[in-house]
Design a protein with these regions (language model features):
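Local sequence-structure signature of Cys/Sec-based thiol-disulfide redox active-site neighborhoods
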Residues: 6-39
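Thiol-based oxidoreductase modules, predominantly thioredoxin-like and allied folds used
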Residues: 21, 42-56
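CheY-like receiver
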Residues: 56-60, 92
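Structural micro-motif
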Residues: 60-69
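Non-catalytic, surface beta->alpha helical segment in thiol-disulfide oxidoreductase systems
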Residues: 72-95
Length: 95
């Protein structure tokens, strides 16, 4: 899935979203995608394939995948890398 980062949520009250940096060859990325789906975090997730959209990965300084970045509008709130459990993801969002 190739999704570009879009900025078309005008009028929305909650501008938080998760950027999920991934690659087709990355096994932990596939596991993390399943954990994210199960966690049902309630935020939009934009998927960025670092091989297809390398300029975006460079812009965000991505050094490894999987990497998640929590954004509030255009501000990076926090990030984490590596495989995580559903519980770790929920704690990360709510922390």
């Amino acid at each position: 899935m190739n999704t570009t980062v879009k900025q078309n949520n005008r009028g929305a009250t909650n501008m938080k979203k998760i950027l999920r940096f991934t690659a087709s060859w990355c096994q932990p990325c596939k596991g993390l995608a399943m954990q994210l789906e199960e966690a049902q975090l309630g935020l939009p997730i934009e998927v960025i394939d670092i091989d297809v959209q390398s300029e975006i990965a460079m812009e965000y300084g991505i050094r490894s995948v999987p990497t998640l970045i929590l954004m509030d509008e255009h501000i990076e709130m926090k990030r984490m890398s590596g495989m995580k459990t559903k519980q770790q993801l929920t704690e990360w969002i709510n922390d």
